Amino acid sequence: MKTWPVDLGSKLEVVTPFLGKHRPFVGRCCQRCTPKSWKSFFHKHLTSLGFCNVIKITEENTRYRGWLVRRLSYFLTVCDWQFCNDTPVNMQERIFHSKRVQDIVSQKVSQGKGDAPVASVSVAQWMKDIHRILGQIQSALSPFLLRLCSWALLKLLNQMFLNVILHKGQLEMLHRAVKTADVPVVFLSSHKSELDGLLLPLLLVSQGFSMPRVTWDYKAYTSKHRALLTHLGGVFLPPAVEQVSDSRMGVLSRAVLASYLEELLLSRQRLLIFLEEPFSGVPQLSASGREWLALVFNALQTGNVPDVLIVPMGLSYDVAPGLIRSGRANHTQPRSLWMSLRTICRAACQGLGCIRVDFAQPFSLQEYVANSAFRQSSSGKHLEELLLPEVLGKCPMNLDCEKLEYRSSDSYGAVALNMKQQTLMDNLSLHSLSTAVSCSAIMAVGITSALLLHKHQEGVFLSQLMQDFVWLTEEILLRNYDVGFSGQVRHVVLHTLSLLRRCVSLHRLSLGDVLVAPRRTEAAVTELSRHSAALLPVFIQEAVGACAINALLVELLPYLGSPEQLRDAVFVQEELYNKTASLVQLLPRDIILRQPCQSVYYYCQVAMDKLIQDGLLVAEEVTSDRLACDAAQKNFTKKLLWKATDGFEDSDSDYDEEAGKQCFKLSHLENCTDVFMFLCCLLGPLLKTMRRAVVFLEELECPQPESQYMEKLHQFLLRKANEDCSFDCANKTLAAVSITIYKELGVLRELPGQTGPFLHLSQTFAAKANQEKLEKFIEQFIWQSAC
């Protein structure tokens, strides 16, 4: 690693307190939804709290000693690993005799139009179809390929990364949970790279766990690539599950898939499901992850599997393989085996820093379902009913109502769930994603990228960057997130700059310091944006609250003589909550990580409390001659609409009508403006993309396929980004999120099509005036210096 002999004083050379003296135990399961699991695996009973480097293999990891063993340690270690048993030999017969498949054979399901009569299909033909579908789902494991690829992967990982870190206490917790529960185990992991599906099984096997079956996306890989992955333990959703519900092959594929998963769990094999889309940039549930989790949930609901142990996992890279070029990559084209090998080899030549893998506290799926079903509310409204009146300026939003999840009319799931079960499964997905993200360690590259992108866009001295790095790391640890690094501050920061060498330029100054300037090219801004997105979950509630305050300042600005007077503006607590709730309802729950057991009121309350704890908001007593930002319509907001049910401290019996009139103002401390801007900028890329998507509505002349609309919107965002170098807003994932939000809001309507849904502009937003109102509504939350 290249270093610079710069004398920055002794204060920054010491190991600061957050590096080694305090590391939070992250990833606790929800005490409300799974209280028994929360007690069973409490971390105070764990004895091992250190870390281990999984890819550091020596003769100590083998049963032998000697100079030859030291040279063959990787090979001998892999030979000692115990891989999981293969699926039962009679799997096909057991699936054929399962109730689901027998219902189809005996004509207990409806026939599809144009299909051959079911009675004319022989048993041999049924077995042949089941065999073909099973071949699309999985293949027999190859012990030779498993050991060969594990040995090669260990070699590559040592070339690509400095270390791959696991927490020993989390491993002990997981071993105890698996042994105590004695039920099937399903790992629900975050997803950062295509390497994850090979890396995580290797880590689990190396620590004495059975190798899990890994879920992969069928359409993302070529046939030869899929064949190799299935022999290594990969499983796929057969393509026929997406066919219309009355198609014979679609019905049979769904029945075979559901029966296969039940047999997999009953045979006590592990399953690894990725909850996120790779390279998404924001926490976002993947479609395939939902399907696999729905299958696990359905196996429990039918009673065929008594219980499942859910283990959320967090995965963090300094630099993920393939991340740099993922922005321009065409994800619609299947990846060949050669493309994947080329990506891995390129990463091995570059050096990508470190990896940290964390296991959250396991919990019982049966316990979660029982507790959540008891508390589940049937009331709720769609986003269009909740927020559209406020967007159009007609009346305030009813903040006391829960938002119903949007479901596309063109989608067909792998398993049929009723509305109550679907809601319960969606809540499980959100809970698991939130836990997986919260237990993911924050890497040094993400911290440095966020500082360069959101705070020091014009450049910063290395000494100041180190001070800000220390400050931001302490803030992360105070929010009960862990960091994936340790050591002297100078060494850590210089290491991150070496990994970000394509994104920054360094200039030695005559004063003995170094100027670090982020590049403004598309590749540099895109990479910094993707790295800095790791900090959004840490500060998401404060970011939502800061953007809500920014919206109130925008409303107040026309009534003031100059922007300088905004520092003395006073906000009424009720209006702060209203504006925060508007943004909370607008954004998807998986992005803002609002757990299903948290009401909108509770989420807004925590956001305001955190801003007060950070010192950004201070309480203020308002006199009659002071200007307070209380723009609420009094006939609709005579008292708070929320009923606090998230804790005893928020009991409705303690509600005081005057509490809603408590006032706050922005702090006048020196660094508060910078912190406020930093928090607003974390949500800036998403909000700015949404605003530009509104401007793009003018180009939607007629119904067109959603994929075509997405591509045109992405090209529009790229053109806008070229004008002001805002390439962090030209992300395809953010464009897709914007389209989903506007479909929920009633801006875009869906029409069914043969190749997919068609989008057209709703009648309400065909009017230019309503488009301008929507743009103004989004723009109020955006920090203006980032516009």
What are these regions (language model features)?
Residues 1-787:
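Membrane-interfacial terminal anchoring regions of lipid-handling membrane enzymes
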